Each structure stands twice: as C-alpha cells, then as structure tokens.
Curated annotation (Swiss-Prot):
Its EC number is 3.6.4.-. CDD domains: Rho_CSD, rho_factor_C. Signal peptide: none annotated. The keyword Nucleotide-binding applies. Keywords: ATP-binding, Helicase, Hydrolase, Nucleotide-binding, RNA-binding, Transcription, Transcription regulation, Transcription termination. ATP binds at residues 169-174, 181-186, 212. The keyword Translocase does not apply. GO terms for cellular component: cytosol. Homohexamer. The homohexamer assembles into an open ring structure. This is Transcription termination factor Rho. PANTHER family: TRANSCRIPTION TERMINATION FACTOR RHO. It comes from Allochromatium vinosum (strain ATCC 17899 / DSM 180 / NBRC 103801 / NCIMB 10441 / D) (Chromatium vinosum).
Length: 418
C-alpha cells in the first residue's frame, strides 16, 4: 500500500476502506488520522507500506520527506529519514526519494523510512557518483523548446508569438516584465500547457509565490506538471522555504541529466519575501530593499543554465513593473541584465484586449541564432524590420491578425512571401 495514493483519495473513500478493514471509530476522524489508522492496520497484518517525497534535511542532521501535494509544507504525515541513511546514500536536500516505510512505534510521531528504493527516479547506487550541480559547465541554450501546438486555438497564438519574438531554449533564463493586469499569469499558463503538450520529457514545475488561491487552483487544473504554491496569506518565511525546496529539487534532477523547467510567478514577490526574512544589514537601498536581500533570489534565478555534461534547468520568471511601488522597480532593475531572454508586456495593448500584450521591439532572446536554422532566422529578422517602424500597439495588432489567419508559423511565413 502506498502512502501517497492514500493522501490523494477523497475522505469518503478512505472511510469506506477503513470500515472494510474493520477499523473502529473512523466516522468523525480527520483525514490524517484515517490514513494513520489504515496504515497501522496494514502493518499489523505484516504487509509492506511504501511512501515517497522530497527530502528536506534539518540542521540537526536528520530529515523528512515532504509531500509535493502539500507544497512541501511540514505535516504530520511526513516521513522521517535518519542521519545514518543520509550519510550512507550521500543524500542532499531536494532529493526525490521513494521506499519502504514503517508506521510510528509507541512514543514516535512520524512514519520512518526503512529502505530506499529510488533516488531521483534512479537506482540508489547510481546516485553516489553524480557530479554536483555547482561543478557543471554552463552554456547558452542550444536546443529549442517549441511552444506552438498548431491547433489554431487562441491560446496557441500566445505560444506562436513567443516562438517568433523571443524563442525559448532548454536552459534559458527568461524574464517576463509586466505591469499589473497585462495578462502575465495567463501567458505563463499558456507556456506551461505548451511545454506539457510538446515536451512531455521535460520535468515541469510551476511555482506560484504570493498569488491568489483561485489562480493556484486554476493553474493546477489546467497544467500537466507539478504546481507548487504559497498564497498571499502565508508568511514570508513560507514563501522562502517553498522556493528553496523547489530549486534544490530541480538541481538534483539536473544532476541526473534531466531537463527541468520552472515557471515562477513572480520573482518580485519572492524578492520581497527574502527582503522580509533576511536579517537587517544596516544598508538599505532605495524603496526599502536591504542590500543583502537580493543575493538569494539572484542565486535562485542564476541557477538556470544549459549544462555541457547533459541536462538543463530553464527558469521563466515574471517581474512586476509600474505597480506604484518603488521597491518593485528596484527589484526589476537588479534583475534586468541577468536573464538571457526578455519578454516585455504592455498595458496599453492589454487594455485594447489584444493578447498576448507583448511589446515586440523590446522583447527578444540573446544568441537566438543557436536555437534555429539560418532560413528561419532570416524570416524572423525580416518580420522585425517590417514591425519596427510601427507603434508597439499597431505592431502587435498587425501580428495578431496575421497569426489568427493561419494555423502554424510556417504557414504564416509562407503567406508573408505571397
């Protein structure tokens, strides 16, 4: 029996399962207590129980396997991992571990890990010889992440516009710069759907920091991938802990030569959370940002890279501007030159209800010639030459109308020739 499967079951099903196993007094129990009772009954029968999670090592040397469904929040159903197991398998925070577990004995509060079956979806003996993420050689993105699905839907127009204006590669470090209400969250959702559809081999994580709860639900229902969130009613320490767990997990997967994509909404809110958490250094920049506060969010964003030894970590993060807060502008200025791809969104275009509201002239990818063939590059440069003299609103409107008339970008380029 698997602990993770039990967590996903609705409460009425758990109650029915408990009653079928003749467990008494389950009528008005909490979901947690139900799972405990079921697993204890299973263990008494001598059956094996399995569980999995992402390891968080605490300062005392032991660790816990946190659940992605609970956005890595500490809970009573976490699985205890002993210091001897951590040393034996050279485990680090962020390792995804699955294995055999046992229920708590008298006086214990947590399930404990008995035997490790998998580390980062790989055999445990393979995990010991991995190169550390910090020792990898970073390169420019070279393999393209094509977003176009080619079904002619309105959502696909966003993906096709990004493919034309600022193509994304595996290992890209991209910034989506947007004023409020310009459609940045919808754009991230479209990107997530495209990656889930076109690149199922990529491990997709959507990280929502300081967002509205209903947007988290909508994202979780529409995206094929892991949606991790810390809503605006959570404390800043929680935002920071979630972000640290996600980036550590991503690094461990890249060490196993996986391609990981993180979509972060938004890096501004994450930087604000770090600003609240970091101890005061006495040096304060404009807008109330502590001089040391941006070090850790920069480390998060800077982890995105294409790795020569195999694997890649792509991070696309949204940055807020024109919010009326001086702090947000300072945070954006600090991150401005750090990415190798930028998409600028324009409120004026969004107010005219043209989506995606992209300012084409200001958006682009560095070294885009590595991502595409010479013929496609020439076509894109010709398109930019046509759009450049226009006002940004007229340029986006022109491109939007042309894309709406065709199903794919190849078709669009053919129609341009004619």
């Amino acid at each position: 029996m698997n602990l993770t499967e039990l967590k996903k079951m609705p409460v009425p099903n758990l109650v029915a399962l408990a009653q079928s196993m003749d467990i008494e007094g389950v009528g008005r129990s909490r979901k947690q207590d139900l799972i405990f009772a079921i697993l204890k009954a299973q263990a008494k029968k001598g059956e094996d129980i399995y569980g999995d999670g992402v390891l968080e090592i605490l300062s005392d040397g032991f660790g816990f396997l946190r659940s992605a469904d609970a956005s890595y929040l500490a809970g009573p159903d976490d699985i205890y991992v002993s210091p001897s197991q951590i040393r034996r398998f050279a485990l680090r925070t962020g390792d995804t571990i699955s294995g055999k577990i046992r229920p708590p004995k008298d006086g214990e509060r947590y399930f404990a890990l008995l035997k490790v079956n998998d580390i980062n979806f790989d055999r445990p003996e393979n995990a010991k010889s991995k190169i550390l993420f910090e020792n990898f050689t970073p390169l420019f993105a070279q393999k393209r992440l094509t977003l176009e699905i080619g079904n002619g839907s309105t959502e696909d127009i966003t993906a096709r516009t990004i493919d034309l204006v600022a193509p994304i590669g595996k290992g890209q470090r991209g910034l989506i710069v947007s004023p409020p209400k310009a459609g940045k969250t919808m754009m991230l959702q479209n990107i997530a759907q495209s990656i889930g559809h076109n690149h199922p081999d990529c491990y997709l994580i959507v990280l929502l920091i300081d967002e509205r709860p209903e947007e988290v639900t909508e994202m979780a229902r529409s995206v094929r991938g892991e949606v991790i969130s810390s809503t605006f009613d959570e404390p800043a320490t929680r935002h920071v802990q979630v972000a640290e767990m996600v980036i550590e997990k991503a690094k461990r997967l890249v060490e196993h030569k996986r391609d990981v994509v993180i979509l972060l909404d938004s890096i501004t809110r994450l930087a604000r959370a770090y600003n609240t958490v970091v101890p005061s250094s006495g040096k304060v920049l404009t807008g109330g940002v502590d001089a040391n506060a941006l070090q850790r969010p920069k480390r998060f964003f800077g982890a995105a890279r294409n790795v020569e030894e195999g694997g890649s970590l792509t991070i696309l993060a949204t940055a807020l501007v024109d919010t009326g807060s001086r702090m947000d502008d300072v945070i954006y200025e600090e991150f401005k030159g750090t990415g190798n791809m930028e998409i600028h969104m324009d409120r004026r275009i969004a107010e005219k209800r043209i989506f995606p509201a992209i300012n084409i002239n200001r958006s682009g990818t560095r070294r885009e010639e590595l991502l595409m063939g010479q013929a496609e590059l020439q076509k894109m440069w010709i398109l930019r030459k046509i759009l450049h003299p226009m006002d940004e609103l007229a340029a986006m409107e022109f491109l939007h109308d042309k894309l709406k008339a065709t199903k794919t970008n190849d078709e669009f380029f053919s129609s341009m020739k004619g």
